Amino acid sequence: MRAPRGEEDPVSVIAYVLIQTEVGKAAQVAAEVAKIQGVVSAEDVTGPYDVIVRAEAGSVDDLGKMVVSRVQLIEGITRTLTCPVVNL
């Protein structure tokens, strides 16, 4: 699932957002997160996290705003962990 991105938005930061949800809410949460601009993919997974999101943003600040003001407000999410990609 991929949300639309404007061509004018440069990508400087890529991150994975690991999401824990209420029981039985993973598919619903993944579908809602996938609608957010900057989200490249949102997949249900098994293990300690229920949904893993790949997101792109123009800066670390923009990424933080996306997670705090958009992702974390979705009903059914109990916890998030944001992991920025680094090139070593």
Put a short name on every predicted segment.
Residues 1-88:
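A compositional/biophysical signature of low hydrophobicity enriched in polar/charged and small residues
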